[in-house]
A protein has these predicted regions:
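A structural "flexibility-hinge" signal
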Residues: 1-161
């Protein structure tokens, strides 16, 4: 399994990534970090829940394939140029009706507005799909043992507990 967990995702976003997110959301780095600490496990859990049904897994697999080839070599640049509208749609697929409630909860804990949280999450969602998609593609190339999407998401979440 390719080495990817919540800690490594947070690490990738440190520095330029947090700065880019802070600029786009008009938030301090500490606030962005607080949002990410809460949001990444939430997004991964949402994806895992979606992947628990055949239709959800199929939809998520398609999204991962669509985003796997995104160029994320410069995360700061990726986040500055990300399509926030696409990110918002991704969030709706991942979180469904709870999107606004979750954003409000994260906003309260992070000391920023729900709109700022939504901007950050809308930027991070395509990056998350890209990283998961490329990790899944690597796993399929390395070892075609039938490990599913739920296994990948579960391994990511186990690193956050």
């Amino acid at each position: 399994m390719a080495s990817l967990d919540v800690s490594s995702l947070l690490g990738m976003l440190s520095g330029d990534g947090v700065s880019a997110l802070g600029k786009s959301a008009d938030a301090k780095k500490s606030q962005v970090s607080s949002v990410l600490d809460s949001a990444l496990p939430l997004l991964l859990t949402g994806m895992k829940n979606n992947a628990s049904t055949k239709a959800g897994a199929s939809s998520l697999n398609k999204a991962l394939k669509d985003h796997a080839k995104d160029d994320t070599s410069d995360i700061g640049s990726f986040l500055q140029n990300v399509d926030l509208s696409d990110g918002g749609k991704i969030l709706t697929h991942i979180l469904g009706d709870s999107k606004e409630r979750e954003a409000a909860s994260i906003a309260e804990r992070s000391g920023i507005s729900s709109d700022q949280v939504m901007t950050i999450l809308s930027a991070v969602a395509p990056l998350l799909l890209s990283k998961l998609g490329s990790s899944k593609a690597e796993d399929e190339e390395e070892d075609d043992d039938g490990a599913g999407l739920g296994d990948l998401l579960g391994s990511l979440l186990s690193g956050s507990e």
